[in-house]
């Protein structure tokens, strides 16, 4: 099933009609180019969105624009920084429910929040009730992406739960955690890029948020519907996450060598009363070596917990740090994640460090070692079901341009590029060109992994990296013209990469 995070068949929203509407924007891109998901401001310093928008995302990777109808007109002062990201603890896949997340802004926002629908109102709504959904996403129901810089809105109908389940496939799994909306005949829907945005209903003349754009089979297709996370079902979860305890839910420590590793978690009290944090514990043999959270945490103050972990061997490693809090917050869990690989061949490392001079870098190898090509480096010579990866850790904040090419069996043998643990691009077939990435964190990790399947080979069956260019600037140049965004043929420019990064990467 082809799922889309998906406004089709609508119209431009009147200015200032939806002051709570928010855009989630990749840091380093302008509002029009960088928006990849919608969201809604729910008060104080909190923004509601979809969990699937935030795969491997930390607050420092993104910004939020609230109440701006035209994203291209948003100024830097209107871009709000994000301190923390909270994803529903039971989220695994949008089709399985729990597709909900909260962004905690670095500062309180003074704008008008959206009211959330109560369970009693949700349960009283009849099938056919008119709903309004909005976003800056795809306006073309075909495979050709056509986004919008001005906010769009469209009216759709609430669909009965059983009617939606009868569509079959993943629709059959829909429970009380979600609901469907659309038209039986199709033609109106949310679409790719609208994910995380609100769908609202008029309740005695006041618009309230009923759901969050989650997924759907295509966009605006006959007999198919958009699926939305049911906000009222998550009322307690939302209330808990907005009580004012700020903490690190997920910590990515990057790629490291085996040995003793430490991580520090920060807890901040942004509530209206003193917080008591207690019963700290860890899993997977990690130990707490320093804890400044043993005393009551006063309003507006922080405390820290430092852990030590003996990392043995290579692979992916994680452990949890849990603690209890008062004020009805209950148990809080943070997960610390490491990746460990052997160091790369020193000659390969020297070549990379020569491309990115004057930085403290570590270069690691994954699977089969990379080798030198005529003008740069290339993935190793692979047999079936093997992979060859290179990882560069410690790159400073800025942007990185890669002159690269791929020669492979289209759609089967791929070069995958990860930034800070998040898949940003998969390229196959015959491709060459330059791709650029924003590196938003103080220290960043980029990985290039060529993956070969169990079947045949075509072309050189390798990925090639010919040159690397680093800039401390965090803003990628805007582009007036769009390329196709294809990842399987022809030249590969940074703009086509962005189309993949912001949209095609998100399959819902």
Predicted ranges, named:
Residues 372-395, 412, 431-436, 465:
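Short beta-strands within extracellular/lumenal beta-sheet-rich domains
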Residues 35-55, 62-63, 68, 147-162, ...:
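C-terminal subregion of chymotrypsin/trypsin-like serine protease catalytic domains
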Residues 1-47, 57, 63-68, 184, ...:
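Protease-domain processing segments flanking chymotrypsin-fold serine proteases, especially trypsin-like
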Residues 491-508:
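A cross-kingdom C-terminal cell-surface attachment/processing module
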Residues 24-27, 47-50, 55-90, 161-167, ...:
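Conserved H-D interstitial segment of serine endopeptidase catalytic domains
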Residues 70, 74, 78-81, 97-186, ...:
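Chymotrypsin/trypsin-fold serine protease catalytic domain
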Residues 212, 221, 243-342, 476-486:
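Feature for long, exposed domains in two main contexts
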Residues 448-459:
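Short beta-strand-plus-loop segments that form exposed binding edges in beta-rich domains
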């Amino acid at each position: 099933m082809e799922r889309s995070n998906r406004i089709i068949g609508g119209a431009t929203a009147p200015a200032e009609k939806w002051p709570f509407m928010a855009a989630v924007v990749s840091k380093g891109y302008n509002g029009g180019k960088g928006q990849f998901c919608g969201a809604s401001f729910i008060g104080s310093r909190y923004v509601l969105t979809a969990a699937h928008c935030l795969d491997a995302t930390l607050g420092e990777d993104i910004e939020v624009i609230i109440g701006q109808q035209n994203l291209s007109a948003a100024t830097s002062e209107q871009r709000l920084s994000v301190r923390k990201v909270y994803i529903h603890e039971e989220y695994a896949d949008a089709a399985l429910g729990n597709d909900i997340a909260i962004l905690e802004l670095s500062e309180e926002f003074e704008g008008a929040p959206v009211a959330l629908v109560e369970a009693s109102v949700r349960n009283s709504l009849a099938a056919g009730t008119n709903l309004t959904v909005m976003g800056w996403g795809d306006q073309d129901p075909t495979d050709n992406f056509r986004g919008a810089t001005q906010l769009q809105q469209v009216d759709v109908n609430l669909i009965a739960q059983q009617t939606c389940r009868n569509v079959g496939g993943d629709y059959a799994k829909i429970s009380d955690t979600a609901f469907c909306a659309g038209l039986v005949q199709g033609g109106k829907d949310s679409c790719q890029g609208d994910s995380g945005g609100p769908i609202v209903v008029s309740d005695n003349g006041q618009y309230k948020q009923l759901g969050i754009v989650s997924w759907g089979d295509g966009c605006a297709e006959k007999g198919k519907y958009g699926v939305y996370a049911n906000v009222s079902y998550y009322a307690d979860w939302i209330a808990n996450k907005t009580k004012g305890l700020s903490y690190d839910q997920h910590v990515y420590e990057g790629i490291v060598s085996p040995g003793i590793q430490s991580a520090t978690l920060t807890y901040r009290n942004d509530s209206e009363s003193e917080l008591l944090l207690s019963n700290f514990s860890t899993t997977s043999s990690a130990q707490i070596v320093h804890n400044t959270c043993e005393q009551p945490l006063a309003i507006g103050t922080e405390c820290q917990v430092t852990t030590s972990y003996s990392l043995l061997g290579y692979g992916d490693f994680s452990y949890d740090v849990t603690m209890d809090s008062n004020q009805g917050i209950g148990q809080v869990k943070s997960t610390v994640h490491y990746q460990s690989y052997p160091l790369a061949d020193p000659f390969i490392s020297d070549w990379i460090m020569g491309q990115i001079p004057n930085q403290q870098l570590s270069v690691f190898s994954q699977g089969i070692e990379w080798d030198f090509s005529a003008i740069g480096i290339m993935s190793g010579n692979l047999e079936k079901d093997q992979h060859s990866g290179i990882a560069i850790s410690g790159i400073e904040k800025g942007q990185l341009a890669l002159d690269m090419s791929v020669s492979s069996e289209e759609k089967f043998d791929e070069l995958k590029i990860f930034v800070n643990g998040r898949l940003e691009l998969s390229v196959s077939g015959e491709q060459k060109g330059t791709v650029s990435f924003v590196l938003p964190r103080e220290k960043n990790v980029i990985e290039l992994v060529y993956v070969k399947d169990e079947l045949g080979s075509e072309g050189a069956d390798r990925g090639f990296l010919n040159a690397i260019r680093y800039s401390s600037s965090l803003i990628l140049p805007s582009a007036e013209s769009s390329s196709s965004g294809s990842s399987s043929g022809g030249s590969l420019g940074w703009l086509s990469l962005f189309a993949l990064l912001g949209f095609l990467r998100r399959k819902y």
